UniProtKB/Swiss-Prot annotation:
Role according to the record: Associates with the EF-Tu.GDP complex and induces the exchange of GDP to GTP. It remains bound to the aminoacyl-tRNA.EF-Tu.GTP complex up to the GTP hydrolysis stage on the ribosome.
Protein name per Swiss-Prot or TrEMBL: Elongation factor Ts
Subcellular location field: Cytoplasm
Disulfide topology: none
Signal sequence bounds: none
NCBIfam families registered for this protein in UniProt: tsf
Membership in a protein family: Belongs to the EF-Ts family.
SUPFAM superfamilies: Elongation factor Ts (EF-Ts), dimerisation domain, UBA-like
GO MF term set: translation elongation factor activity
Region (Involved in Mg(2+) ion dislocation from EF-Tu): 79-82
Amino acid sequence: MASITELIKQLRASTQAGFMDCKKALEATNNDIDQAIKWLRENGIAKAAKKVDNVASEGVIKLKLADQKATILEINSQTDFVTKNDQFVAFSNELVDLVHKHETTDVAKIEQLKLASGSTVAETQIHLTAIIGEKISLRRVAFVKEEANSSLATYLHSNSRIGVIVKTSKTDDKEFLKHLAMHIAASNPKFVSQKDVSADFIAKEREIAAAQAQSENKPKEFIDRIVDGRINKVLEEVCLVNQKFLVNQEQTVQQAAQAKKVEILSFIRYEVGEGIEKQVSNFADEVKAQMK
């Protein structure tokens, strides 16, 4: 019969749980490894429940382009350190394959899908939260199909924090598509062109520009003209086709695309944590949180 030290070693290897947690689990289950794993999972889930309200604003972007379709998703953690954890990496890789296969963007439905382990995505997230000690959650998913008259390209930045899918008219110029996707990642446009800009966006920007002009004590008779100029500048910044192409600053993206006889149809750009308000805590609060 294996010694208690050997059992603890086996249990730690199987669950990644801490030494004392493994010791308690074995004591509670009369040194039965299988029951101890179950005990740790049950208690781990209980511990994980304390973390579900934590803000997970770090994480990774995952991309997959295959079979004439592209999938992009964001998985969040509380710190970027976790993104290098082997179990987190394995989970995120398996998850993007699963989502790509099922062609769904509904997070609630995805969380009920089963992974190779037999556990659902939701169960696995809770399990990872328990053993890693940080909230792990799938935040959002997008999915794009490539039709006969279109082409897709993807780009994932080296730190896996920014990912892009871009869809254009049909082209075999893979280098241009790659550069276009990289440009979108770096320049962060909000729209393809001005026709995609909402009236609400323009109205809000006009309000901001007018307030700025008034605060600068510009003559009232010139304010409308100043506002128009600033709106045009904003549209240059937020519309992809109006931006200077990073590969060749002498051209706009539109001019570069026209030279290649390519029409840009749509794009999706994900950046980790965008739109999430991050938690700010002082050192004392962090210590207290660790002691709970």
